[in-house]
């Protein structure tokens, strides 16, 4: 009995330190948010660049630290709905690797919608980024795009954030 308890304790200790495997991200679904845009003359259109990091370098350039990314798309208006028209995800080399929002979606006042890039999805690399096209009625309150990168491995943890910048083209 004593041997059995000792073995059980050893197994529990060893497995509790094991890193949990991240599941593959589910397809990003927005069909319940798809909408037709109001007339173009009632909207201001814009574009925002958001830097993210699928991984960062640790010790040297061949050793990386994988990160989970949460992209937050925030409507900061208290009264007007905003529209996300399109979103593209690019890797470090600038290659488009994924497309989000194939049809316009709405974000209600003070609402946030999110995209999660799983920790084991390193396709974007250390210089990944998004470009979002959007439309708003209230020119004073453009959407806010933020990303939070996080990893907790063993006893180490790292987290940081980035904020989108409007681009004009």
Model-based region annotation:
Residues 13-16:
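C-terminal motif of bacterial Sec signal peptides marking the signal peptidase cleavage site
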Residues 21-29, 121-169:
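Terminal connector regions
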Residues 25-47:
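Post-signal peptide N-terminal segment of mature Sec-exported envelope proteins
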Residues 56-64:
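Short, solvent-exposed beta-strand/turn "edge" segments of beta-rich domains on protein surfaces
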Residues 64-70:
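Short, solvent-exposed loop/turn segments enriched in Ser/Thr/Gly
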Residues 73-80:
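Asparagine-centered strand-capping/turn motif at beta-strand->loop junctions
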Residues 80-87, 99, 142-146:
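Short, hydrophobic/aromatic beta-strand segments
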Residues 92-127:
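Intrinsically disordered, low-complexity Pro/Gly/Ser/Thr-rich segments with frequent PxxP/GP/PP motifs
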């Amino acid at each position: 009995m004593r041997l059995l308890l000792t073995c059980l304790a050893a197994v529990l200790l060893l497995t509790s330190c094991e890193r949990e495997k991240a599941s593959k991200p589910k397809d990003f679904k927005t069909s319940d948010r798809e909408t037709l845009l109001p007339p173009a003359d009632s909207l201001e259109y814009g574009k925002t660049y958001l830097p993210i990091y699928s991984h960062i370098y640790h010790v040297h350039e061949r050793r990386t630290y994988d990160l989970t990314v949460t992209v937050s798309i925030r409507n900061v208006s208290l009264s007007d709905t905003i529209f996300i028209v399109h979103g593209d995800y690019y890797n470090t080399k600038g290659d488009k690797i994924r497309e989000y929002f194939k049809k316009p979606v709405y974000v209600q006042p003070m609402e946030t919608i999110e995209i999660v890039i799983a920790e084991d999805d390193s396709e974007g690399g250390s210089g990944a980024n998004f470009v979002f096209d959007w439309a708003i009625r209230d020119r004073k309150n453009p959407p806010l795009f933020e990303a939070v990168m996080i990893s907790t491995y063993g006893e180490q943890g790292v987290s940081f954030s980035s904020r989108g910048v409007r681009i004009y083209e």
